[in-house]
Amino acid sequence: LLDTVMASVSLFDEISVSRRADGRINIVCPAIKGENTALPAAKLFQERFSTCGFDIRIEKGIPVAAGFGGSSADIAGVLYALGKMFRKDFESLTEIAARCGSDAPFMLKGGFARATGRGEKVAPFECGKTYHLVAAKPSGGVSSGEAYKLYDEMKRQGRIPENMADGLQVAKALKKGDLACLSALCVNDLAVPAKKLLPQIAEVERMLGQFSPACLFISGSGSGVAAVFETEVKASACARELEKRGVFARAVTTMQRGVEEI
């Protein structure tokens, strides 16, 4: 069972929607081959409200298979855009999002939240602090399904260290702005299987560690790594240097909203 904390940050995809004269739904996302995860959400929206068809274009800024929640962010962004275009209430959009993924409703609302159970129990919490991070990843990605499968296998073999941290304590540390406590609590059980599936993750961790972040952890099931810094200046300097070394790295800040109009 999960016990995790989620936070919205200023790493984003850009989504545009337009009406069609027919009933077709067309999604274009140059960065992703095959069916986009936002398509089922778009179909559910159309079925729920009996709308015309629409064209959707997604420009990825959130890397794929990084554990940064890009798929759920696209579901949320598409539903938000369609809701605006067809003037539908936020509650209805949240209901559709919940049918598409456990964290999709959170992505729609944004801010901070603790997720437990299988990820379906999401409890938002207020956090007045703004955190400065670097979101980085190696060139490869990690499949969430493969990471969880390997975790179960390694857990049975006793190869996963016991983790006593819990999301409630992480939430308290975030509210207080206690970076020392946060550093001690930010443990990801999927880190071991993720690094076994993609050893390059450890190299990105090492590079981030050279800039002395207050906190460093693998995001989700990887391959992305997040580092928390005391100041925006430190985060920006780290991101610039990693970019020079050919690593995807972005300086980001925590946000109180999940989706924004631009």
PLM segments and residue spans:
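Phosphate-handling active-site elements
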Residues: 47-57, 81-99, 231-244
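ATP-binding N-lobe of GHMP and related small-molecule kinases
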Residues: 1-66, 84-90, 127-133, 137-140
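DPxDG-like acidic metal-binding loop motif
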Residues: 66-97, 106-110
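Residue-level signal for inorganic ion chemistry
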Residues: 15-17, 38, 71, 136, ...
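Active-site glycine-rich loop that binds ribose-phosphate moieties when present
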Residues: 95, 99-100, 114-124
